[in-house]
């Protein structure tokens, strides 16, 4: 299946939207050393990865709960992220404004967790928000109605903000249904959002376990030089492999309990992965993740 997704990525690179000249052209600022630029916002630590490509890493204890990315093209800016409260949106906009006067033409919503109407609904009026069709269904099903302009797609889409390509791929089921990853081929930078956690067990409460494993295989196949996870520092393909190894060990252990007929309650009482105790979020999230994995695997593997 990941081979099919890889083909989708290549095909999506061929489907482009044209650049719109919203501001006078200026020479892009030279890339500086990988240090944060001071700006009036508290959510993100900004790290330049390549000319015009920036990782927005969620600060510990800050308002942001997941990382983001933004790309400054010759004509406009593309930003991407998830779990966006009004404060986090404004902080990301401030971080971008500290580096360019070009407009944010598109914001890519990487995914949305159904039932959470305090996030992903406060983009400014007039902001174009791109998402997968599955994410749009989640947004559209909420009690709260979005006031921003939305566009959604099926498999893939490539944006051309000027001098760089921003390739969007709809992974389908993984962390949620309709996860989007963002690849900048010229910089070999990949934004994986919450499909990837580095040094963390992550949140799996809406995940699709076997599909998620296939998605991780797909991310490895891209072989990006720098990968922005949903949580943790900027990494590379080795970090995808390591998270995938944890994920496989986790699911293998869950299946052992299911196959011997243990109930969910018995599994929760006895489950343990001592070799991963040091990972961030283990104590807080492992049982929640276990409930989701037990239910998902039971539905798919039990006769």
Regions found by a protein language model. Give the residues of each.
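Metallo-beta-lactamase
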Residues: 30-31, 48, 76-78, 82-86, 134-256, ...
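Divalent metal-coordination and catalytic microenvironments
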Residues: 52, 71, 81, 96, ...
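Active-site HxH/HxHxD metal-binding segment of metal-dependent hydrolases
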Residues: 94-160
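Bacterial N-terminal signal peptides
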Residues: 5-16
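Conserved beta-strand hairpin/beta-sheet module of binuclear metal-dependent hydrolase folds
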Residues: 47-94, 180-184, 189-192
């Amino acid at each position: 299946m990941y081979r099919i997704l890889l083909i989708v990525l290549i095909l999506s690179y061929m489907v482009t939207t044209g650049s719109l000249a919203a501001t006078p052209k200026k020479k892009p600022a030279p890339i500086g050393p990988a240090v944060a630029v001071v700006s009036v916002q508290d959510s993100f630590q900004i790290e330049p990865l390549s000319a015009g490509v920036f990782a927005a890493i969620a600060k510990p204890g800050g308002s942001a709960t997941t990382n983001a990315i933004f790309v400054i093209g010759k004509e406009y800016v593309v930003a991407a992220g998830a779990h966006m409260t009004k404060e986090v949106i404004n902080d990301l906009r401030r971080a971008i404004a500290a580096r360019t006067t070009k407009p944010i033409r598109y914001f890519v919503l990487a995914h949305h967790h159904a039932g959470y109407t305090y996030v992903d609904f406060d983009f400014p009026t007039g902001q174009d928000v791109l998402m997968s069709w599955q994410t749009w269904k989640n947004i559209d099903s909420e009690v709260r109605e979005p006031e921003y302009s939305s566009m959604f797609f099926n498999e893939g889409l490539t944006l051309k903000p000027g001098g760089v390509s921003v390739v969007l791929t709809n992974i389908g089921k993984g962390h949620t249904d309709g996860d989007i990853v963002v690849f900048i081929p010229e910089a070999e930078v990949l934004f994986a959002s919450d499909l990837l956690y580095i040094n963390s067990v992550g949140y799996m409460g809406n995940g699709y376990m076997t599909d998620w494993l296939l998605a991780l295989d797909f991310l490895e196949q891209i072989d990006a030089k720098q990968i922005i996870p949903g949580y943790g520092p900027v990494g590379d393909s080795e970090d995808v492999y390591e998270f995938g190894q944890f994920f496989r060990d986790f699911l293998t252990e869950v299946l052992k309990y299911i196959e011997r007929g243990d109930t969910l309650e018995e599994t929760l009482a006895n489950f343990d992965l001592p070799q991963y105790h040091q990972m961030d979020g283990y104590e807080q999230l492992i049982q929640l993740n276990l409930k989701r994995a037990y239910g998902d695997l039971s539905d798919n593997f039990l006769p």
